Amino acid sequence: MIPGELFIQDGEIELNAGRKTVTISVANTGDRPIQVGSHYHFFETNPALKFDRKKARGMRLDIAAGTAVRFEPGQTRDVQLVALAGKRMVYGFRGDVMGKL
């Protein structure tokens, strides 16, 4: 074995299997790029991102952990969100929830 070596089985890994998802259209109305990480509570993202925030409450981007999506100024794109898991309690971020969802 070599330090850091990976042994990967054949097949595919399905991320977030069985969780509720929703696809929403997001527009960056600001004049700067906005990047959102994989586990950021999407409901609480930068106010320059315009989308149906009610649909995004309790959701995060449905992308691999540690990755992000970048929204360029004036750009509109569809993104898929996935429900937060665990105890479904949100603290920090912009401070809009601070507790149970």
From Swiss-Prot:
Q: Where in the cell is it found?
A: Cytoplasm
Q: What class of enzyme is it?
A: hydrolase
GO molecular function: any one? urease activity
Question: Which catalytic reaction applies to this protein?
Answer: urea + 2 H2O + H(+) = hydrogencarbonate + 2 NH4(+)
The family database entries (SUPFAM superfamilies) matched by this protein are listed as: Urease, beta-subunit
Family annotation (Pfam families): Urease_beta (PF00699)
Question: Which residue positions does the secretion signal occupy?
Answer: none
Entries under CDD domains matching the protein: Urease_beta (cd00407)
* GO (cellular component) term, any one: urease complex
Q: Does the keyword Acetylation apply?
A: no
GO BP terms: namely: urea catabolic process
EC number(s) on file: 3.5.1.5
- Going by the entry's taxonomy, the superkingdom of the source organism is recorded as Bacteria
Binding partners and assembly: Heterotrimer of UreA (gamma), UreB (beta) and UreC (alpha) subunits. Three heterotrimers associate to form the active enzyme.
Family of this protein:
Belongs to the urease beta subunit family.
- What is the name listed in the Swiss-Prot or TrEMBL entry for this protein? Urease subunit beta
Q: Which organism is it from?
A: Bradyrhizobium sp. (strain ORS 278)
Q: Provide the organism lineage as a comma list.
A: Bacteria, Pseudomonadati, Pseudomonadota, Alphaproteobacteria, Hyphomicrobiales
Instruction: Tell me the gene name.
Output: ureB
